[in-house]
């Protein structure tokens, strides 16, 4: 064998190896599915509760200044609903077999974490894929209701309380706000709008009780387990107003007024009868008996309304019938969540879900006091207001006008203007 012939054979062998290698590489590439190169997402709705400050906080951000309420997009900064991101197909994926893509998508979904799993309270986003599908629309509806309530409240404040944004928050403005630090919640107490049961819920959230049913009325109202916001120094107040979720629950004003009257004056009461009852009977009942003046018992609803509307009333106001706009200062404090007594169960449990409360905690439905007595309803409210003249009804409506306006309640009587 000559050296020239050996060299030619080696060259041919090397060329054959390169040719087979290139052919194998092309075959391998042609068998790959380009869809594997593009990320897949599980279909569903992504609900995002984003903090405003600090970034790692999982709660809704609140501003104490009305001037900072509106974001450029026009959506509230508290609850934020986002549509799901649509997966982007790879440019070469159009020709891939449909069956192969579906099979690989199913395999990918199986590897995803379970929907609705909370990956920790420090996460700034909560991904919820409610089941069944009807829960999706329910969640969206409750979210939209919150947006509308806050919009109405902002507009009323802008129209009638234009100077509020320039006022500083003082301890007096936050004296009715209760603090729950574990879940970073601030709750403004509105008496006769479910406040007793809300305090029970806060005590369970704080780890002070295992069940709302175990907490007695006196513990709720006369104990010191829950802190008020005005007990903190200024730095503590400002910090919590800026970073905690602030919420309040309201009630139809006439209905709330009647509920307060029934509770405080139609049942024995060692405080309201001697303090308010005696003063009301002495001023507004002609020829009141000695017994009535001694005990303060037996105040009638028209007499109570006379006291309420009197600018020179003989005894001051009380939180049970004071305006919500005075109790909670909603034009000065930017509340993230506005619930209503009339839709308490839905609103309360929606709120508990938003703050990642324990799954077994729901809002209690029992009546706190006088459980044998019917709740104050619209029908009962009309019966009490039927005892008043049309002028008294109008003046009472005027008295609560800001509450009707801010919380979008309809006029309770057709002859009101």
UniProtKB/Swiss-Prot annotation:
Source organism, top-level taxon: Eukaryota
Major localization class: Golgi
Membrane topology: Single-pass type II membrane protein
GO MF annotation terms: dermatan 4-sulfotransferase activity
Record topology, Cytoplasmic segments: 1-10
Spans traversing the lipid bilayer: 11-31
Residues noted as binding 3'-phosphoadenylyl sulfate in the record, renumbered to the chain: 191-197, 251-259
Region feature Disordered, mapped onto this chain: 47-101
Biased composition (Basic and acidic residues): 56-69
Top enzyme category: transferase
Tissue: Strongly expressed in brain. Weakly expressed in lung and kidney. Weakly expressed in pituitary.
Pfam families on file: Sulfotransfer_2
Spans within the Lumenal topological domain: 32-417
Cell location: Golgi apparatus membrane
GO annotation (BP), single: proteoglycan biosynthetic process
InterPro entries: Carb_sulfotrans_8-10, Sulfotransferase
Keyword set includes Transmembrane: yes
Gene Ontology CC annotations of this record: Golgi membrane
Family: Belongs to the sulfotransferase 2 family.
Role this protein plays: Catalyzes the transfer of sulfate to position 4 of non-reducing N-acetylgalactosamine (GalNAc) residues in both N-glycans and O-glycans. Required for biosynthesis of glycoprotein hormones lutropin and thyrotropin, by mediating sulfation of their carbohydrate structures. Only active against terminal GalNAcbeta1,GalNAcbeta. Not active toward chondroitin.
Protein name: Carbohydrate sulfotransferase 8
Organism expressing this protein natively: Mus musculus
